[in-house]
Amino acid sequence: MDAETLSLSLELVSGSGPGLSAEQCAALRASLPLLHRDLRLRRLRLWGVVLGLRGDYVIARGWGGPDLLRGQLSFYSLNCVDWCLLPPATDAHIAQTQGIKGRFVGDPAHEYEYIVRNTAGGGDSALEEELTTHIKEEVRLTGTIAMIDREAAVAPRGAYIRNPLGQVIVNHSFRGLEVSEGKKLSSYFHFTPSLNPKKKSLLEKAALDPSIDFLDSLEHDIPRGSWSLQLEQGDSVLILRSLLWLGMTFYHVPLTPLHGHLYIGTGERNLDLPFMI
């Protein structure tokens, strides 16, 4: 959610469970504009909160360039006032993060210990070695945010366009989805570069607009039923919740450009989802 519409956006997702306290909201309204100005960012959004045992990580996302799918900067704060820059997420960070189980502690310097199994040699003489590896919680936080973005960050169809330079930018002509369109999962896209593009037939491609239909639709997600879509607050706001990453909530006010997503959760993937649907 954008820093400029923080109060309204928090009100729209208030029915999704834990939120931010009045003190946190007041601190964010004061600190986010300063972060935006000091780093000369083009855009700044509140990404969410990763809940820890001793402290919570408040996450903000900034962009220094026009492309909203590349060059993102992630920041975290333990008090909603002082912000620290997170290292860029890499495939190695994500792989390391997937090997760690349990809640976040709330201390960026905390070190986790996990075992990596390597196979040495080949054939009948192959030996499996167990290596103990350490990873800091700050790196785990980076990898977790990247995984949530890949699997649960959402944008409505038409809200962003790809220009002739290949940059993904805000579509200023977007006026919101109709209520009838907003009730369909096909009207929402994963707001992340496509990892496994779905092959489409010529008939399907003919019905698409390449400037706005360049992302993956939620209707093809596996397993089916991993999203909950409903109208709330007197049918005035569309709410889309991820059941894979509990705490990720997307909101959109129909017939207006107002939309966004917020994550407030423990940073753990819901591995029980296949047994719940």
Swiss-Prot record:
GO biological process: axoneme assembly
InterPro entries: RSP9
GO CC, alphabetical: 9+2 motile cilium; kinocilium; radial spoke head; sperm flagellum
Compartment(s) where it occurs, according to its Swiss-Prot or TrEMBL record: Cytoplasm, Cytoskeleton, Cilium axoneme; Cytoplasm, Cytoskeleton, Flagellum axoneme; Cell projection, Kinocilium
Coiled-coil region: none
Keywords: Cell projection, Cilium, Cilium biogenesis/degradation, Cytoplasm, Cytoskeleton, Flagellum
Main location (coarse class): cytoplasm
UniProt entry tagged with the keyword Manganese: no
Quaternary assembly: Component of axonemal radial spoke complexes.
Function, in words: Functions as part of axonemal radial spoke complexes that play an important part in the motility of sperm and cilia. Essential for both the radial spoke head assembly and the central pair microtubule stability in ependymal motile cilia. Required for motility of olfactory and neural cilia and for the structural integrity of ciliary axonemes in both 9+0 and 9+2 motile cilia.
Membership in a protein family: Belongs to the flagellar radial spoke RSP9 family.
Protein name as catalogued: Radial spoke head protein 9 homolog
Gene: rsph9
